[in-house]
């Protein structure tokens, strides 16, 4: 499983459509394995769902996200946890604990 987080300086970036980076976490046996930072190369909103799908992402954790982007993620089969704030690493750890 792969979890992506909208990312800026260790924190969850608060606007999905404007994020310039995702931190992607490879999850193995319910634990965080390898992580990497991916630049979005200027892609925004709906294009980001395709970008994440191409990277094999199953789940997205982010701050604010509009209805169009939510629909694009749903169509791509990516589970969404929106409205999240705080440290990216902690959010992923919490997600693993409570799912």
What are the residue ranges of the model-derived segments?
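Conserved small/polar residues in nucleotide/adenosyl-binding loops
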Residues: 98-99
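Short, acidic/turn-prone active-site loops that include or flank metal/cofactor-
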Residues: 43, 84-90
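N-terminal first-folded block
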Residues: 3-39
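Short acidic active-site motifs
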Residues: 11, 47-48, 90-91
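Well-formed, non-transmembrane alpha-helical positions, independent of function
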Residues: 51, 71-72, 94
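Internal alpha/beta domain cores that form substrate/cofactor-binding pockets in large enzymes
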Residues: 11, 35-41, 71-80
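Mid-chain, well-packed structural core segment of small domains
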Residues: 58-84
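Compact, glycine-rich, soluble single-domain proteins
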Residues: 34-55
């Amino acid at each position: 499983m792969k979890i992506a987080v909208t990312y800026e300086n260790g924190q969850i970036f608060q606007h999905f459509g404007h994020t310039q980076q995702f931190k992607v976490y490879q999850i193995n046996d319910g634990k965080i394995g390898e992580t990497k930072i991916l630049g979005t190369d200027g892609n925004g909103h709906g294009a980001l769902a395709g970008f994440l799908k191409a990277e094999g992402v199953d789940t997205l954790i982010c701050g604010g996200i509009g209805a169009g982007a939510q629909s694009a993620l749903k169509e791509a089969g990516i589970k969404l946890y929106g409205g999240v704030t705080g440290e990216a690493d902690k959010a992923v750890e919490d997600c693993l604990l409570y799912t």
